[in-house]
C-alpha cells in the first residue's frame, strides 16, 4: 500500500468525490481536501488522521493558501461539479471546473516541482477529445453536444476544462501531467468491474452506465498505480461498467 503519496482533492464532498476520498484513505494516501463545508464529509472519512480538510470556497481561496495546499502533493484530483439545482446549473460560477483546473495547474507551475504533478480530472462523455478523435461521435451528435454546451453551462465548463488540459498543458509540460476521466451516466452500485476505452463507445441517445464506485476506483488507481498512470497519462479514457473486473 502506498503510504507516502499526498493528494489535494477538490469536490471531496460530492457523490463521486466522497468515494474517491474514502478509497484514497483506505489505500493509505494522505489527503488534503478543500471543501465548502466539512460537515458534508462522510462520517467514516471526516475523522481520519490522514485527512486534512480545509473549509473554503476553492475559487476564492487566496493564492498563497492554495500554493501551500498544493506544495508537496504528488497529485491533484478534481471531482468538482455543478450542483444539480437551478442555481447550480445556471447560476455562477459557470466556470467552476475549468477555473479551478486552471488555478490548481497554475499553482503547480509556480511551485516548479522536481517531478510532474498528476492532475486527474473527472470529466464526462459529453466532452469531446480534440481534433475529432472521437470518431464514434458523428456530425449530428456533435451538433447536439454543441447545442447542449450553448444551453447548459456545466456542459461547456467540462469541455473548457478538458480543452485547457489538452491544449494549454498539452503532453510535454514540465510540471503537470494529466488524465481526464470520462464516465457515462453516473449510477449507484458497488462498482465490481469496469472497462476503459480510448474513445467513445456509446451514443448520447443510448448511454452506458458508470457507477460512481468504479470512477472512484479508477481515479485512485491513477494516483497510486504507476502502470495505470503510464498507460493513461495525457489521455481521456471513457469508463463504463463491465461485468468482468479489470
Ligand atoms: N451526472 C452524471 O451522469 C455525470 C456523468 C459524467 C460526468 N459527470 C461529471 O462528474 C462530475 C462530478 O459529478 P458528481 O455527481 O459526483 O458531483 P456532485 O455530487 O454534484 O459533487 C459536486 C462537488 O462539487 C462541489 N461544488 C459544487 N458547486 C461548487 C461551487 N460553486 N464551489 C465549490 N465547490 C462546488 C460540491 O461541493 P458541496 O458539497 O459543497 O456542494 C461537491 O463537492 C461533474 O463535473 C459532472 O459534470 C456527471
Regions found by a protein language model. Name each.
Residues 6, 74-75, 118:
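Structural motif
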Residues 2-27:
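N-terminal Rossmann NAD(P)H-binding glycine-rich loop of SDR-like oxidoreductase domains
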Residues 33, 39-103, 110:
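NAD(P)H-binding glycine-rich loop region in Rossmannoid oxidoreductase-like domains
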Residues 87, 91, 102-152:
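Conserved Rossmann-fold NAD(P)-dependent oxidoreductase catalytic core, especially the SDR/UDP-sugar
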Residues 162-188:
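Conserved beta-loop-beta element that borders a ligand/cofactor-binding pocket
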Residues 14-15, 203-246:
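Mid/C-terminal beta-alpha module of Rossmann-like enzyme folds, strongest
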Residues 10, 34, 79-80, 119-125, ...:
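SDR active-site strand-loop-helix element
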Amino acid at each position: 500500500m502506498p503510504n507516502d503519496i499526498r493528494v489535494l482533492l477538490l469536490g471531496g464532498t460530492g457523490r463521486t468525490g466522497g468515494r474517491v476520498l474514502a478509497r484514497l484513505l483506505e489505500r493509505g494516501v494522505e489527503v488534503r481536501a478543500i471543501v465548502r463545508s466539512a460537515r458534508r464529509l462522510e462520517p467514516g472519512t471526516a475523522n481520519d488522521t490522514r485527512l486534512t480538510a480545509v473549509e473554503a470556497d476553492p475559487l476564492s481561496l487566496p493564492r498563497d493558501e492554495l500554493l501551500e495546499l498544493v506544495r508537496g502533493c504528488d497529485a491533484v484530483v478534481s471531482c468538482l461539479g455543478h450542483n444539480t439545482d437551478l442555481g447550480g446549473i445556471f447560476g455562477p460560477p459557470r466556470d467552476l471546473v475549468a477555473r479551478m483546473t486552471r488555478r490548481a495547474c497554475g499553482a503547480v507551475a509556480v511551485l516548479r516541482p522536481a517531478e510532474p504533478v498528476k492532475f486527474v480530472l473527472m470529466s464526462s462523455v459529453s466532452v469531446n477529445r480534440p481534433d475529432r478523435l472521437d470518431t464514434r461521435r458523428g456530425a449530428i451528435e456533435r451538433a447536439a453536444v454543441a447545442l447542449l454546451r450553448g444551453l447548459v453551462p456545466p456542459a461547456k465548463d467540462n469541455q473548457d476544462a478538458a480543452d485547457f488540459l489538452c491544449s494549454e498543458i498539452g503532453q510535454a509540460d514540465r510540471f503537470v501531467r494529466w488524465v481526464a476521466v470520462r464516465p457515462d451516466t453516473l449510477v449507484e452500485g458497488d462498482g465490481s468491474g469496469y472497462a476503459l476505452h480510448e474513445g467513445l463507445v456509446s451514443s448520447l441517445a443510448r448511454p452506458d452506465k458508470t457507477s460512481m464506485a468504479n470512477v472512484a476506483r479508477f481515479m485512485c488507481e491513477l494516483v497510486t498505480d504507476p502502470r495505470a498512470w503510464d498507460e493513461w497519462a495525457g489521455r481521456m479514457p471513457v469508463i463504463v461498467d463491465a461485468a468482468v473486473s479489470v
